[in-house]
Amino acid sequence: SAERRFAAISNEVRVRVRRLNLDAASFQQLHDKHVGDGARVRAEVAGIIASRGKMQNPVTGSGGMLIGTVAEVGPQSPLGLSAGDRVATLVSLSLTPLVITDGLERWDGRSERVPAAGTAVLFGRSIAARLPDDLSPELALMVMDVCGAPALVTRVVQEYAGAGRAPTVAV
């Protein structure tokens, strides 16, 4: 099973997937290829994930992000997450091991937002944001999925802090 195959080890975190958000370039390419036929888009996305073990569009190279619930945390994970945390990943799905268990059956293939069930694995170098209980998945996707900006801000701030300098961040 996907759960057994994706047991968290060492510095990994296993996440129960609730929703994928395909990046705009990937979705547009698939939509155009299949002339808006949602069933064909859904079948291709499911096929990409099944064959590659991640959502990495073979034409655009891009993926997206996901929202899920932490199922298991490896004993050496540096991510600061706990089982039960609702999270959004801030690294591309093109870099995230992923198994889908529902065939994306609840998705009509006509938008970037994909209801899904499955399992993903985050590594020690992954970036994930714990989501507040009062933040809807839809709003979280809109706020968090801005071309990797949250991950870039985190990295830049850490570089400044590591050098003993106070960063200035404008939001």
List each language-model region with its residue ranges.
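Glycine-rich beta-strand-centered segment in the early N-terminal region that forms part
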Residues: 5-21, 31-93
